[in-house]
Amino acid sequence: MTTQPRKILVTCALPYANGAIHLGHMLEHIQADIWVRFQRMRGNKIHFVCADDAHGTPIMLNADKLGITPEELIAKAKADHMRDFAGFNISFDNYHSTHSEENKQLTAEIYNKLKANGFIKSKVISQLFDPEKNMFLPDRFVKGTCPKCKAEDQYGDNCEVCASTYSPMDLINPRSAVSGTTPIVKESEHFFFDLPAFEGMLKEWTRSGSLQSEIANKMQEWFESGLQQWDISRDTPYFGFEIPGVKDKFFYVWLDAPIGYMASFKNLCNREGIDFNEFWAEGSDAELYHFIGKDIVYFHSLFWPAMLEGSGYRKPTNVFAHGYVTVDGAKMSKSRGTFIQASTYLNHIDPECLRYYYAAKLNDRIEDLDFNLEDFVQRVNTDIVNKLVNLASRNAGFIAKRFEGKLADKLEDEALFAEFTAQAEQIAAYYESREYNKAIREIMALTDKANKYIDEKAPWVIAKEEGKEAELQAVCSMGIELFRVLMSYLKPVLPKLAERAETFLQAELRWDNIHQPLLGHTLAPFKALFSRLEKKQIDAVVEETKALFAAANKAAEKTEAKPTALSTVEPIAETITIDDFAKLDMRVAKVLKCEAVPESNKLLRFELDLGDHTRQVFSSIKAAYNKPEELEGRFVIMVANLAPRKMKFGVSEGMILSAGTGGSDLFLLSADSGVTAGMQVK
């Protein structure tokens, strides 16, 4: 009985059109591409789409800063993103943009259906308004004095000092973080999606067993804390789609972004005559999978299925979330040269190396993946060059020189061949469940067996003995056959190497012909299939990344605003004695690690080296240093004998010194070169 091909639609999360693609993005796109290529090899009907996420305030503000239109900015971003994905052999059937006619129409349609079904609510809310910029100010764009503890320079929703929450309008002396002006209060009608109405459906979907256990458990926590109505509107000025029938109101970017999956597929359907409803209509028997990062699970497991349910469309079959990429055990860092852009990598290294390395470490769980640069070189060279490609090269020479490229008419070891091909379904199961690490482990175990077979048969010895031509041809043909099976298994991971192998073998590598040996088949002349990865290539990537970071920093310094005539110098504090000053023990400290406190809008957490011990210090300088990882490796000045202070997020064991008026106007104090951690400031 013939099994009907599955109908599958796969998407990746939409990269934001306000920055370059980096190796963190590539984890997800490589993971999805391997799965898609595997499904194609299995004969399934699969479509793979993505798009740029092209709306929102950051794009509007960045375009204004660059002196171009948002449309020009997102057009360049899309071209850059498509180039990078193509460079890594990501086989999208379509790559689109959320700023498209298809997305505009689908967004309006879904909104109107939700509204007609009673799932859109409206209410008038009061917001602070910047009269100079003529824009409403979200919480993070307002600063002022905490109404509870009177701490200065606090954000508009919560105080980092006393942990109080409040409305932006409760702030004392509020100011716009955009222009610095004093905001006024204005009322505005906003539109809300009634997410709580879908709680029953979402709970049932969670219990279906199709979601990753980590996602299902997290959703249960969200249910327990209570679902809230979701504000889906933003006031002008805003770069996005206007809400139908409402003046100066726009859809929040997270409403139209996931609809971009549908829009990209719609664009493909219109171009190739595919039935859109066959994949998206309620009750569709097609499979729909979203590959995403763990940071956007909330939107994809709550808002998105609820929106689809409320507008009469089908829900995803599953949402596959993955973790983040770290480099050498730490967050990616521009200053250390490890925040690697895709284009920088492609300037120096074969993309198949990264595809293989990620595959060797990826599993079906939401775990961070460490990109260890030393291990990267060793694993690629050991597995691909020394084991896999060498298996072909060490046998191809004999077949070409002694037998005019023709393979033997029968298998030298049928049992060994059967052992290799018998693993096809197990390896397929690993690919299907996204346990690529297990698939690679199994394939490499077989590769070791193949090389052991050749080592034991020693064709280089047989070649020197008279009358053993048939044996030599049989052994080397067996080695080539095993290489063919292994390359078939690795084709989803290494598509370009597979293409070169197919040229050499003069045969297509398919899953359904793995069991069919190339008996009596003629090979093409052997050419080098893969180059060894050198450490100097890694060094070049790191140095180019550092140079890009330094150039960007230099450009930013040139464009920084000069202090205005209105700037004032704080008055000198009350006089103290030398004895008072002597009580302070100030030390030079080296930043080992610096990261944002997720629950805080203001704090950075530092891990500091003081020479003979380390300390944890929290500092309210997040607004001034929005890329904290770039501070790692710097020397700072700290007050070391300040009493430890227990805060909401942990114990702070000292104070880091900085200068400025507060907020984004803060500058860390540093020491001249030559200092070491722990030195006392005198």
Swiss-Prot record:
UniProt cross-references to InterPro entries, sorted A to Z: aa-tRNA-synth_I_CS (IPR001412), Anticodon_Met (IPR041872), Met-tRNA-synth_bsu_C (IPR004495), Met-tRNA_ligase_1 (IPR023458), Met-tRNA_synth (IPR014758), Methionyl/Leucyl_tRNA_Synth (IPR015413), MetRS_core (IPR033911), MetRS_Zn (IPR029038)
Motif stretch ('HIGH' region): 15-25
Motif placement: 'KMSKS' region: 331-335
GO molecular function: ATP binding; metal ion binding; methionine-tRNA ligase activity; tRNA binding
Gene3D superfamilies registered for this protein in UniProt: HUPs, Isoleucyl-tRNA Synthetase, Domain 1, Methionyl-tRNA synthetase, Zn-domain, Nucleic acid-binding proteins
Catalytic activity annotation: tRNA(Met) + L-methionine + ATP = L-methionyl-tRNA(Met) + AMP + diphosphate
Keyword Cell inner membrane: no
Cofactor note as given: Binds 1 zinc ion per subunit.
Function: Is required not only for elongation of protein synthesis but also for the initiation of all mRNA translation through initiator tRNA(fMet) aminoacylation.
HAMAP family: Met_tRNA_synth_type1 (MF_00098)
Listed name of the protein: Methionine--tRNA ligase
